[in-house]
C-alpha cells in the first residue's frame, strides 16, 4: 500500500526529491524552503520538545526558564512553549542586540532572542536588581569624598560634571546628582499617583507657613512624612509656595530587566579565550548576559540548571555571583559528550579548524576529545582564577564539582 510518499526506502536521493515533490524531473526546485519542510524542522522539534517538558517538571512553582534562540526557530519555539508552559505564563521576550553581520544578503541581522516563561506567572514577584550603573556613581562619590572631605558643595559640583561627561554610560541613573551629608540622591515626587492622597499641613522650616499641598494629595501618611522630615529626607524650597520633595537615595536605586539588551558577541569569546585558549569553542554564552538575568531571578540557595551547558559559562557565572554576593547558589549542567573527533571529520572551514584546535588543547591537558571536557576544564580554571583574584574573601568559596555520567541504555 502506498502512503503519502512512495514506500521505497532504497531509492536514490535524486529520485526521493522528485517523488516527495521537492524537485521536478528537470531538477527544478518546487519547495521554496526545503529545510523548513522536512526532516530538519522535525528533528529540531524532536530534540527541543522533551527537554522543555522535563524543564517544566523540574521548575519550582516560582521558577522561570530562559531560552536563547535566533530567527530560524523563534516563532516555532514560542508555539511549543505556549503549549508546554501555557501562553498565560509567557513572561516576555528579550531582544539581544549582538555584533553586526558583516555580509548581509538583504537585511543586516543584529539580534537574537531570549524567551522567558514562568512555571506560574501569577505568583511571580516583581523583578528588581541593584543598579550596576548606580554603583559607578557611588564609587565616584566616595572618590570625591576622600578628596574634598565634607565640602558638600564642591563634591556635588564635581559629581554633576562627571555625570554629564558620562551621560551615555549612566543612562537611567544620571538624575542622581544631588549630594548632602548622607550621600547621593535625586529629588522625587511627593504627590500621590491618583486623586485621594493624604492631605495635612506641613510647615516650612524658615517661613513657618503651610507648604503647598499637591492636587492629588501627599503619597505618604502624616507620620511617615514627619519621620522623613526629622531624618532630613525631605527637600524644602525657598519658601512655602514650592512643593516639597522626597530624597531618593542612590543606594536604593534599582534596575528593571529591560526587553532590549546590547552585548558585543565578541566579548564572551575574548573572556573565554583569556581563560582557556584561542579558537577552541565557537560562540560561548556570555557570562555578562547570564549574570544580568540571574541578578533578577536567582536568590541565595537556588539551583540553576543549564540543559545546553556547552563551555560551562553558567558555572563560571554562578561562582562569580557567589563570590560577589557571598551567596550559595548551586548549578547543574547538562551536556551530551559530543565527540570532537567526529565533528572534525565532518566539519568544514572555520568549524574544522576550531575542532582541530580543541583536540590539540585537550591533548595538552590529557583529556578525552569531548565538549564536556572543555566545560569541565573551564570550571576548574574559573574557580582557580576567582580565588586568586580575591584570596581574602574566597577562603570558604566552594568551586568544586561532581560529574554524573549516564551510560547508553
What kind of region is each of these model predictions?
Residues 1-303, 325-328, 336-344:
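Class I S-adenosyl-L-methionine
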Residues 302-321:
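A phosphate-binding catalytic loop at a beta-strand-loop-alpha-helix junction
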Residues 242-250, 309-312, 394-406:
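A glycine-rich phosphate-binding loop feature that marks nucleotide/adenosyl-phosphate handling sites
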Residues 290, 304, 314, 375, ...:
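Hydrophobic, well-ordered secondary-structure elements that form the walls
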Residues 71-74, 312, 406-409:
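Short, internal active-site loops enriched in acidic
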Residues 320-409:
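PRPP-dependent phosphoribosyltransferase catalytic core
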Amino acid at each position: 500500500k502506498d502512503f503519502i510518499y512512495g514506500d521505497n526506502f532504497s531509492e536514490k536521493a535524486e529520485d526521493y526529491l522528485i517523488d516527495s515533490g521537492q524537485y521536478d524531473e528537470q531538477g527544478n526546485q518546487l519547495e521554496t524552503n526545503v529545510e523548513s519542510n522536512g526532516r530538519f524542522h522535525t528533528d529540531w522539534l524532536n530534540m527541543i520538545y522533551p527537554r522543555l517538558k522535563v524543564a517544566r517538571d523540574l521548575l519550582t512553582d516560582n521558577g522561570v526558564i530562559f531560552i536563547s534562540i535566533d530567527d530560524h526557530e523563534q516563532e516555532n519555539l514560542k508555539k511549543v512553549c505556549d503549549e508546554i508552559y501555557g501562553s498565560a505564563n509567557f513572561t516576555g521576550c528579550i531582544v539581544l542586540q549582538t555584533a553586526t553581520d558583516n555580509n548581509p544578503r538583504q537585511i543586516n541581522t543584529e539580534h537574537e532572542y531570549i524567551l522567558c516563561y514562568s512555571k506560574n506567572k501569577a505568583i511571580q514577584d516583581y523583578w528588581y536588581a541593584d543598579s550596576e550603573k548606580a554603583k559607578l556613581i557611588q564609587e565616584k562619590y566616595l572618590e570625591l569624598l576622600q578628596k574634598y572631605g565634607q565640602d558638600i558643595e564642591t563634591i556635588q559640583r564635581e559629581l554633576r560634571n562627571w555625570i554629564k561627561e558620562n551621560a551615555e554610560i549612566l543612562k537611567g541613573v544620571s538624575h542622581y546628582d544631588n549630594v548632602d551629608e548622607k550621600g547621593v540622591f535625586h529629588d522625587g515626587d511627593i504627590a500621590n499617583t491618583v486623586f485621594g492622597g493624604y492631605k495635612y499641613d506641613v510647615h516650612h522650616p524658615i517661613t513657618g507657613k503651610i507648604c503647598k499641598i499637591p492636587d492629588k494629595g501627599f503619597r505618604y501618611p502624616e507620620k511617615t512624612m514627619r519621620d522623613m522630615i526629622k531624618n532630613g529626607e525631605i527637600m524644602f524650597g525657598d519658601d512655602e509656595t514650592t512643593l516639597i520633595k522626597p530624597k531618593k537615595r542612590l543606594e536604593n536605586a534599582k534596575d528593571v530587566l529591560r526587553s532590549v539588551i546590547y552585548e558585543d558577541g565578541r566579548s564572551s569569546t575574548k573572556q573565554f579565550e583569556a581563560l582557556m585558549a584561542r579558537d577552541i569553542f565557537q560562540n560561548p554564552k556570555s557570562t555578562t548576559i547570564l549574570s544580568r538575568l540571574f541578578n533578577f531571578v536567582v536568590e541565595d540557595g537556588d539551583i540553576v540548571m543549564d540543559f545546553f551547558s556547552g563551555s560551562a559559562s553558567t558555572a563560571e557565572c554562578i561562582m562569580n555571583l557567589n563570590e560577589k554576593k557571598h551567596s550559595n547558589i548551586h548549578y547543574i549542567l547538562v551536556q551530551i559528550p559530543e565527540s570532537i573527533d567526529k565533528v572534525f571529520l565532518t566539519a568544514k572551514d572555520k568549524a574544522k579548524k576550531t575542532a582541530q584546535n580543541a583536540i590539540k588543547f585537550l591533548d595538552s591537558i590529557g583529556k578525552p576529545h569531548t565538549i564536556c571536557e572543555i566545560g569541565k576544564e573551564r570550571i576548574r580554571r574559573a574557580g582557580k582564577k576567582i580565588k586568586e583574584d580575591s584570596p581574602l574573601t574566597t577562603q570558604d568559596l566552594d568551586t568544586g564539582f561532581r560529574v554524573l555520567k549516564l551510560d547508553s541504555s
